[in-house]
């Protein structure tokens, strides 16, 4: 970085890459290659880094991703227990069918931690890339939930309404996501040539837009269910002039990698 840096207001989001792999191979995942060799991964060092980040930004958000955070509930519990209540905690998961962990065990985990977890972001895509848990299981998750759906390349737009109808019985909000590896400052707020946005506007009720220079959300509603179309830039820092006239590198995200 060539300028003095500072975190965004409220502190940068701290994303923790869990030190264990998932069994998925989603085509848009850029993290999978990092799990090809798990030597050097360290839960203890990650716990140390979590404590450091808490001391620096005691109100920042923590996001757990991977990998599959729910693949090792004991390790995930240790990480959650290290984070004080001043932070919001988000977990990105496929809530998958797993050989070593039952749905009942995963649901019990959400019950034990429902006061810790701000939201569990559950991947459910139009195309099936993993063995998913039944939708009825998602309706039993004790903590707040949101469905995440990456609309990847030639997605089947004619299935969008049926997809949303699928989750109406559980009243779980849905976030459609643009492939962030293809997001640029030039297309972040592009509307006319954004096929996904135009499909969503055609099928659902558009409610408005919010965002910043780093990410945004186009909001929709369908039969009382809230949906968002989310776009974000694939990097963590932007250059911005502060109110004091100084140009800063604004840090939006801090990564804690698998080795801590």
Show which residues each predicted segment covers.
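Core AdoMet radical
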Residues: 13, 31-43, 57-72, 85-102, ...
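Radical SAM enzyme [4Fe-4S]-AdoMet core and its adjacent flexible, acidic
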Residues: 125-246, 258-259
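Acidic (Asp/Glu)-rich catalytic clusters
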Residues: 53-56, 84, 106-115, 135-142, ...
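Short, flexible/disordered intra-domain loops and linkers
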Residues: 36-41, 99-105, 183-194
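Distinct, well-ordered alpha-helical segments
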Residues: 74-81, 99-112, 131-136, 157-164
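Alpha-helix-loop-beta-strand connector modules within alpha/beta enzyme cores
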Residues: 79-90, 138-141, 214-216
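Canonical Radical SAM [4Fe-4S] cluster-binding loop centered on the CxxxCxxC motif
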Residues: 1-45
């Amino acid at each position: 970085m060539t300028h003095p840096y500072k975190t965004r207001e409220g502190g940068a989001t701290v994303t923790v890459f869990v030190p264990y792999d998932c069994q998925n191979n989603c085509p848009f995942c850029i993290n999978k290659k990092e799990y090809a060799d798990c030597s050097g991964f360290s839960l203890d060092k990650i716990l140390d880094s979590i404590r450091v980040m808490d001391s620096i930004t005691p109100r920042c958000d923590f996001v757990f991703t991977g990998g599959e955070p729910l693949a090792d509930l004991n390790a995930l519990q240790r990480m959650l227990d290290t984070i004080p209540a001043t932070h919001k905690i988000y977990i990105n998961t496929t809530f998958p069918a797993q050989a070593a962990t039952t749905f009942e065990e995963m649901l019990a985990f959400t019950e034990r931690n429902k006061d810790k977890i701000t939201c569990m972001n559950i991947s459910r895509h139009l195309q099936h890339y993993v063995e998913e848990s039944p939708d009825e299981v998602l309706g039993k998750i004790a903590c707040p939930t949101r469905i995440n759906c990456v609309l990847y390349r030639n997605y089947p737009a004619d299935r969008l309404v049926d997809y949303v109808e699928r989750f109406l019985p559980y009243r779980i909000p849905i976030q459609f996501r643009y492939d962030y590896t293809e997001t640029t400052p030039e297309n972040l707020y592009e509307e006319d040539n954004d096929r996904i946005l135009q499909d969503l506007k055609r099928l659902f009720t558009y409610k408005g837009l919010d965002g910043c220079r780093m990410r945004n959300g186009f909001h929709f509603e369908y039969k009382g269910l809230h949906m968002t179309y989310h776009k974000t830039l694939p990097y963590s820092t932007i250059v911005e002039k502060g109110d004091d006239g100084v140009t800063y590198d604004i840090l939006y995200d801090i990564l804690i990698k698998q080795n801590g």
